[in-house]
Amino acid sequence: LIDMDSNIIQKGKEKIFIPKASFTIISTLMDVPHKTVSRSALVFYLEQAYHHEILDNTLTVHIASIRRLLGDEYIKTHKTVGYFWDFDVFKVG
């Protein structure tokens, strides 16, 4: 369960606060589940959200951080292309 207003993801009984930039990545990937979003598109979305240049390595660091928080099974890598959210998404409320 994801609370889009407070950047909190509930995984089982655990509530996990997701930093804003990482949450931007998660919500972007969840908008098109099971479809690859290119690295360059994700960098673009982050740059638009934060109004400054984002280095490619910064994206890699955020993806690694998300995987540490949630587990490897949620975000998958499409090698040399980008990433995709590997779970079905249902919006409630």
Specify the residue positions occupied by each region the protein language model found.
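A structural micro-motif at secondary-structure boundaries
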Residues: 1-24, 84-93
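A beta-hairpin/wing motif
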Residues: 77-85
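A conserved catalytic-core signature of glycosyltransferases
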Residues: 4, 32, 80
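Positively charged, aromatic-enriched patches within helix-turn-helix-type DNA-binding elements
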Residues: 13-18, 24-61, 68, 73
